[in-house]
Amino acid sequence: MKRTPHLLAIQSHVVFGHAGNSAAVFPMQRVGVNVWPLNTVQFSNHTQYGQWAGEVLAPQQIPALVEGIAAIGELGNCDAILSGYLGSADQGRAILTGVARIKAINPKALYLCDPVMGHPEKGCIVPQEVSDFLLDEAAAMADFLCPNQLELDSFAGRKPQSLFDCLAMAKALLARGPKAVLVKHLDYPGKLPDGFEILLVTAEGSWHLRRPLLAFARQPVGVGDLTSGLFLARVLLGDSLLAAFEFTAAAVHEVLLETQACASYELELVRAQDRIAHPRVRFEATPIEL
């Protein structure tokens, strides 16, 4: 019997709705990965509602929880670590301590960093120290880096002038250490308004993918978290980076189709679960080079 992969997911959690681990854990489980959720914050709901309750996990709890797993002899079974929203830079450094601990036991373990830097216009606010940590420390340790356009701009220190400029900015990130950069949302001058575009960049090649942009009265939250989680899950299940990229685009689109059909503000993960595991749509990425 083929072994089921195990993944430690260290990011935010909301009691109601879907963001962070609440957007990523169930879909990763649904495609066949055992997920160990470690919640960096626990909020009542995501911050775009304008109000929320909850608290940030104390940084020292992260390595303590990792050591607790080690104490029962299970840490070596961890095949990958996913990190997302951070409440503080100290939390981020605690995560890197955990990543190093896991990689010392299992050198093949992968680390995907979703460098959430905040989007004030959407109500997602991240302290500057977190952005600095992601730029200066986390990127160097990550096997996979999954920024959106705003985060890519922050890494590059500028805005793109074209699609090929986005590609150049993502390629420059490879020099910081990651094996691959997945840009979860592209935005650049001249981009067609009816499409949603993503980019995968590796040392071996780069691919661009465009899918239809769906209209919502209020844009659902958690799409980036869902994207990062599914991409890493599919890699653990044996997909090539390109196959994982294309599968993720299809599965995320299926979730958004179901969410749109329900006129829902929250992602309809449960209703779309079969389509997450077995997408009916398919998107083919196009090779792109400078």
Curated annotation (Swiss-Prot):
CDD domains from the UniProt entry: pyridoxal_pyridoxamine_kinase
Keywords: ATP-binding, Kinase, Magnesium, Nucleotide-binding, Transferase
Catalytic activity: pyridoxal + ATP = pyridoxal 5'-phosphate + ADP + H(+)
Binding site for substrate: 12, 47-48, 225
Pathway info: Cofactor metabolism; pyridoxal 5'-phosphate salvage; pyridoxal 5'-phosphate from pyridoxal: step 1/1
Requisite cofactors: Mg(2+)
Top-level division of the source organism's lineage: Bacteria
Binding site for ATP: 114, 151, 184, 211-214
UniProt-listed InterPro entries: PM/HMP-P_kinase-1 (IPR013749), PyrdxlKinase (IPR004625), Pyridoxal_kinase_PdxY (IPR023685), Ribokinase-like (IPR029056)
A Pfam family matched in the record: Phos_pyr_kin
GO biological process assignments: pyridoxal 5'-phosphate salvage
MF GO annotations: ATP binding; magnesium ion binding; pyridoxal kinase activity
Record-level GO cellular component terms: cytosol
EC number(s) stated in the UniProt entry for this protein: 2.7.1.35
Quaternary organization: Homodimer.
Stated role: Pyridoxal kinase involved in the salvage pathway of pyridoxal 5'-phosphate (PLP). Catalyzes the phosphorylation of pyridoxal to PLP.
Family stated for the protein in its record: Belongs to the pyridoxine kinase family. PdxY subfamily.
Protein known as: Pyridoxal kinase PdxY
Species the sequence originates in: Pseudomonas fluorescens (strain SBW25)
